[in-house]
Amino acid sequence: MNDILAKILAVKAEEVATARQMRSEAELLREAQARQDVRGFAQAIEDKIAQGKAGVIAEIKKASPSKGVLRENFDPAAIAATYAVHGAACLSVLTDVQFFQGSHDNLRRARAACPLPVLRKDFVIDPYQVISARAMGADCVLLIVAALAPSQLRELETLAMELGMDVLVEVHDAKELDIALSLKTPLLGINNRNLRTFETSLQNTLNLLPQIPAGKRVITESGILSPEDVKLMRSHQVHAFLVGEAFMRAEDPGVELARLMG
């Protein structure tokens, strides 16, 4: 792992160590367990799809390592509100500071501004981050197979579910998919962007579809830029999408969501 992902994970390990010194895991766990406000993330996606619509996880991110700043005029609450009005099923909020210019506060503000369930989008490598996700109000956490050993994936999934959250497991290739299929979560994200090179191809989702059993909800991630991309995926029975960049670059992200999903 000699690449962008490795660099990010090294920073995450430092961040977790620092956070633990500021606040004990036991104290954070008490706060997370005291929250009784989980919104059903997987259910929100299924509800949209049952209505014949796309289940869109609409992302809130200011910047990315590959593209730099995506949105100068960045107001997480306003973006969340327009996403909700224009039919998003859920939100994804970047909480990574160094690489995506995100924050915990962005997640809190976005969630407070609308009724949608929220994914904490970050590079989770430690139970502390899962507990922190629930404490800040997240309804779902992202686990990236490329970043974690199978035993870690199982441990973190179990913890997230014990705290009432859903889990989105993300894969990029057939080897990672095999590992992900051993987890309990029905939410299977296929990232069309290679996290090692940051290149994107929608073919990635289509190539992996034949290997995915019934009972898993496929969410195609990255590279969905046009209504044609959406139609292509839906013609292959992929009805859930995680979209960020296309919305962030638009004048009104919610209006762009409605346009993209037709």
UniProtKB/Swiss-Prot annotation:
InterPro entries according to UniProt: Aldolase_TIM, Indole-3-glycerol_P_synth, Indole-3-glycerol_P_synth_dom, Indole-3-GlycerolPSynthase_CS, RibuloseP-bd_barrel
Superkingdom, taxonomy of origin: Bacteria
Reaction catalysed by this enzyme: 1-(2-carboxyphenylamino)-1-deoxy-D-ribulose 5-phosphate + H(+) = (1S,2R)-1-C-(indol-3-yl)glycerol 3-phosphate + CO2 + H2O
GO annotation, biological process: L-tryptophan biosynthetic process
One GO MF term: indole-3-glycerol-phosphate synthase activity
EC number(s) on file: 4.1.1.48
The protein's annotated pathway: Amino-acid biosynthesis; L-tryptophan biosynthesis; L-tryptophan from chorismate: step 4/5
Keywords of this entry: Amino-acid biosynthesis, Aromatic amino acid biosynthesis, Decarboxylase, Lyase, Tryptophan biosynthesis
Family from the record: Belongs to the TrpC family.
PANTHER family, per database record: INDOLE-3-GLYCEROL-PHOSPHATE SYNTHASE (PTHR22854:SF2), TRYPTOPHAN BIOSYNTHESIS PROTEIN (PTHR22854)
Protein name (database record): Indole-3-glycerol phosphate synthase
Organism: Bordetella petrii (strain ATCC BAA-461 / DSM 12804 / CCUG 43448)
Taxonomic lineage: Bacteria, Pseudomonadati, Pseudomonadota, Betaproteobacteria, Burkholderiales
GN (gene name): trpC
